[in-house]
Amino acid sequence: MATHSSFTATTPLFLIVLLSLSSVSVLGASHHHATAPAPSVDCSTLILNMADCLSFVSSGGTVAKPEGTCCSGLKTVLKADSQCLCEAFKSSASLGVTLNITKASTLPAACKLHAPSIATCGLSVAPSTAPGLAPGVAAAGPETAGFLAPNPSSGNDGSSLIPTSFTTVLSAVLFVLFFSSA
């Protein structure tokens, strides 16, 4: 239980950072070359539906199956735009979250949902990672990776600076709301 409570205690802060950086990465997507097509919806709000998945996909997590509203949140994300799952994985390193790639890639199967392969996300994953493993099947060891966000192009015109300021203010408001209700 101590592991679950430590994830619960960090969830509000994680969500705020995730919202901030996801908004910036989605708004700045036109400046980057990506393998996966750009999502057609605002992923930052959709990803919040997957907050309970953090304990399952985080490196060092001991949760054997998705908890709480993880699967229903994942279903919501996949129904709206499956590319938002890629956005969540891509932004994980910039949020300070190290993913267990093996478990993250089995999340849809663990929730009995169909999702595009993690390979379609255009992520730099070690070749030894086994995204096709069935839930409950472990590789030689837990594989982890922090995905690096792409470097901004040299032609960045700074157009994402205004949305970043708005996102920062929105994040601060959410931060206060989360901690004042706790």
UniProtKB/Swiss-Prot annotation:
SUPFAM superfamilies: Bifunctional inhibitor/lipid-transfer protein/seed storage 2S albumin. Disruption phenotype: No obvious defects in morphology. Plants lacking both XYP1 and XYP2 have morphological defects in vascular development; e.g. discontinuous and thicker veins with the improper interconnection of tracheary elements (TEs). Glycans are attached at N100. SMART domains: AAI. It comes from the Eukaryota. Its main location: membrane. It holds the Pfam family LTP_2. GO terms for molecular function: lipid binding. A lipid is attached at D157 (GPI-anchor amidated aspartate). The keyword DNA repair does not apply. Keywords: Cell membrane, Disulfide bond, Glycoprotein, GPI-anchor, Lipoprotein, Membrane, Signal. It is a lipid-anchor; GPI-anchor. One of its GO terms (cellular component) is side of membrane. It is found in: Cell membrane. One of its GO terms (biological process) is xylem development. Disulfide bonds join C43-C86, C53-C70, C71-C111, C84-C121. InterPro entries: Bifun_inhib/LTP/seed_sf, Bifunc_inhib/LTP/seed_store, LTSS, Plant_nsLTP. Residues 1-28 form the signal peptide. Expressed in cotyledons, roots, stems, seedlings and inflorescences, but not in mature leaves. CDD domains: AAI_LTSS (cd00010). Residues 158-182 form a propeptide. Belongs to the plant LTP family. Probable lipid transfer protein. Proteoglycan-like factor that exhibits xylogen activity consisting in mediating local and inductive cell-cell interactions required for xylem differentiation. This is Non-specific lipid transfer protein GPI-anchored 31. It comes from Arabidopsis thaliana. The gene is LTPG31.
